[in-house]
Amino acid sequence: MVVNPCLSFLTSYQSTAVSQDALAADLSHFTIRKAQVQDLASLAEMLTDSFHSQTGIMGWAYPVLRLGIYEDLRNRLRSTVPHYVCLVALAVVSGVGGSREELAGTVEIALRSPSSWQPRRSQYPYVSNLAVSKSCRRRGVAKQLLLACEQTASDWGFPDIYLHVLENNHQARQLYLKTGYQLHQIEPSYGAWLLGHPKRLLLQKHLSTTSNQ
């Protein structure tokens, strides 16, 4: 189960994402590193909360979706595929008891093979599963995670990077446009043609020699 894509985990999980009280104390800065096994529970909760609703008719499926995301992510982290990275942003929260790191966001980057309908070309770096804790949104976390992905793609020797966004996700589209992504292709979809579902847009960014600019 890819969002975009331990039985004890089926029980109610208390997220370790940054709380509003902690942010009120002082969110001074955050760091980005590769995800580790101990991050799995927090990452699964953040991804499920970002892409699935806990209310309504599908609310009952939330724990199952969360477990599926947990298992898929665990398998990817264990993989020996050379061109795959899951990154996490850790907020450094300062309070009366001192400072500590808490999960603020995550993103994955891997090489992707072209779909059958796409022009024939070799694999390309593809960004997926970008998610930010609700408490840390509009603080530059997503932008810094994207920049880290761009640096990774550049380190791998690729001149371009790609990602998908739904045409009706205006906030995400605005972020990507501001960070230099451009429309590469509108993905064909029977759901969009027949059912009025939003189209998926494939965006591309050409990477400069200094991708962190």
Task: Give each language-model segment a name.
Residues 2-30, 34-135, 146-148, 152, ...:
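Acetyl-CoA-dependent GNAT
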Residues 40, 138, 172-173:
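Internal amphipathic alpha-helical segments of the cytochrome P450 catalytic fold
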Residues 133-135, 139, 167-168:
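Active-site acidic-Proline motif in GNAT/NAT acetyltransferases
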Residues 137, 154, 177:
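Short polybasic/polar patches that bind polyanions
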Residues 142:
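Conserved phosphate/oxyanion-binding catalytic-loop motifs
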Residues 146, 153-164:
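Conserved GNAT acetyl-CoA-binding A-motif
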Residues 159-162, 166-173, 178-213:
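C-terminal "cap" of GNAT-fold acetyltransferases
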